[in-house]
Structure formats: structure tokens, C-alpha cells
């Protein structure tokens, strides 16, 4: 039924954010492992704060069908804001989703 399908999808989505994804990476700073670090032109001048949620896994640079998570500088990416920048709405929606779930 629809209710069960939506509950299953919400569990899958929250688990994905907390680290059950192809990169084995928690999108929540300070929770889980392999948290993405934010860098800008090979500098780590900006830091993510504990509890913040990063943008996360998106498409690949040259392939919109693929997925990617840039965790460190590489030749084709000089900054990883697209993946590792924290946004307040991510945390707000995550908290809302956790609060309305029946455990």
C-alpha cells in the first residue's frame, strides 16, 4: 500500500544520507564515516560544522547519468562545493523527516 511504500522510501532516503550509499559516506559531519571535506582551490580554508549536512552525491562532471562524490582535489575539480558544502535546508528537512517518523 502507499503508506508502507512511503515509509520504506523515507527509511531508504535517511539511511542514504547517514552513509548507506555507494560511497560509504555519511553526509552528516561528525556522524558515521568518510565525511566529505569542503575544499576550495586546494585550500581547506572553510570547515564543515558537526551536524551539518552537505549537498552530497550528485551527477558526474561529464555524465549526468552517473553519480559522483568529490572528496578531495583532483585535476578536473578545483573546488567541491557541489558535493561538500553544507546547507541549512538540508538539516531542516532531515530533522523534520526524523521528527515525523513513527519508530
Per-region residue spans from a language model:
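Aromatic (Trp/Tyr) and acidic
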Residues: 1-103
